Every structure is written in C-alpha cells, then in structure tokens.
Swiss-Prot record:
Keywords: Ribonucleoprotein, Ribosomal protein. One of its GO terms (molecular function) is structural constituent of ribosome. This is Large ribosomal subunit protein bL27. Pfam families: Ribosomal_L27. GO terms for biological process: translation. It comes from the Bacteria.
Length: 85
C-alpha cells in the first residue's frame, strides 16, 4: 500500500520567465552613448568600434552615432557605432 498519494501533475507547470535578450537597436538606427544595442548570453556578436562590452556580454554604444553590423571573419560578426559625419 502506498504511503503517499501519487504526485500526478503537481510538480509540472513551472517555467522561468523570458530574459528579454536580443537586438535592441538595429543596423542604421541612431543611438546615443550608453544605449544598449544587444543583450546576449556569451559573445554571439562581438564588440566593434565605439561600443563597449558589459560583464553580462551586453553591447552598448560609447558614442552617439549609427549602428552598423559587420562581419569579423567567416564565422563571427561584430557591431560598431559610427559617429554621424
């Protein structure tokens, strides 16, 4: 004879909330210094010119300018900010 009732579905239906990752400012968009461009886990996209990399791998603008996504090499991409001329 069982000493506990079957657990059934009581241990199901839990999930963590989404982390709101992804690109926040797209190519060609104007950004101000400090604006977040990408939130990511790990460096899927690398930091290029005039952008900083936070300790959680967030890429943010260091200067006012326009966002540009570029290739770093065959397998990697980077994002840069170029000041308005």
């Amino acid at each position: 004879m069982a000493h506990k009732k079957g657990q059934g579905s009581t241990q199901n239906n839990r999930d963590s909330i989404g982390r709101r990752l992804g690109v926040k400012k797209f190519g060609g968009e104007f950004v101000r210094a400090g604006n977040i461009i990408i939130r990511q886990r790990g460096t899927a996209t690398h930091a290029g010119n005039n952008v900083g990399l936070g300790k959680d791998h967030t890429i943010f603008a260091l200067v006012d300018g326009f966002v540009k996504f570029e290739r770093l090499d065959k397998n990697r991409k980077k994002v840069s900010v170029y000041p308005a001329a």
